[in-house]
C-alpha cells in the first residue's frame, strides 16, 4: 500500500510523497510548551489553541494510523523587478495553491479507494489538510523522510 500511495502521488503531480506513523510528537510537544510558556510566540496567540491536536494527529483525527505528506514545488522563474515590495513566490499564481493541492489530494484519495476499497481506507483517511489544520507540518515532513 505504501509503494502504491507514493507512486500514485507522483502520478497525480506531486513532487514527492512520504508516509509517517501517526503518533504523538512528544519531544516537539515539550519544546513547544516551554516555548509558549516563555512567551516566544509574541502576539500569535492562535498557537496556544489546539495544543494537543498540533502535537498528536490521532487527537485531531481519531483512528489515524499514518500521516501521508506530499510536496509540490511552486517555484517560478518569474522575477520581481523594480523598487516594489517582494511577494512570496507561492502567491505569484493566479490560482490559490490550496485549491490546486486539495484537488490533487482528492484524486490521490480516489485512486487509493479504487485500488484498496473503501473498507480498507476508513473515514479518517478522507481528512486532507492544506494549511488548514493545527499540524506541525514541517515536523511531519521530516518524519515522512521529506525534510530535515
Predicted regions and their residues:
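Auxiliary alpha/beta "docking" domains used to position bulky ligands
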Residues: 1-148
Amino acid at each position: 500500500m505504501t509503494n502504491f500511495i507514493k507512486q500514485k502521488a507522483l502520478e497525480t503531480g506531486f513532487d514527492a510523497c512520504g508516509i509517517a506513523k501517526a503518533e504523538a510528537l512528544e519531544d516537539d510537544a515539550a519544546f513547544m510548551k516551554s516555548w509558549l510558556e516563555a512567551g516566544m510566540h509574541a502576539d500569535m496567540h492562535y498557537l496556544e489553541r489546539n495544543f494537543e491536536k498540533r502535537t498528536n494527529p490521532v487527537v485531531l483525527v481519531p483512528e489515524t494510523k499514518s500521516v501521508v505528506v506530499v510536496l509540490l514545488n511552486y517555484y517560478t522563474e518569474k522575477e520581481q523587478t523594480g523598487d516594489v515590495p517582494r511577494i512570496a513566490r507561492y502567491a505569484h499564481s493566479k490560482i490559490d495553491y490550496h485549491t490546486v493541492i486539495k484537488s490533487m489530494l482528492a484524486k490521490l484519495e480516489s485512486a487509493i479507494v479504487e485500488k484498496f476499497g473503501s473498507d480498507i481506507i476508513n473515514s479518517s483517511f478522507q481528512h486532507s489538510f492544506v494549511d488548514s489544520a493545527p499540524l506541525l507540518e514541517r515536523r511531519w515532513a521530516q518524519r515522512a523522510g521529506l525534510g530535515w
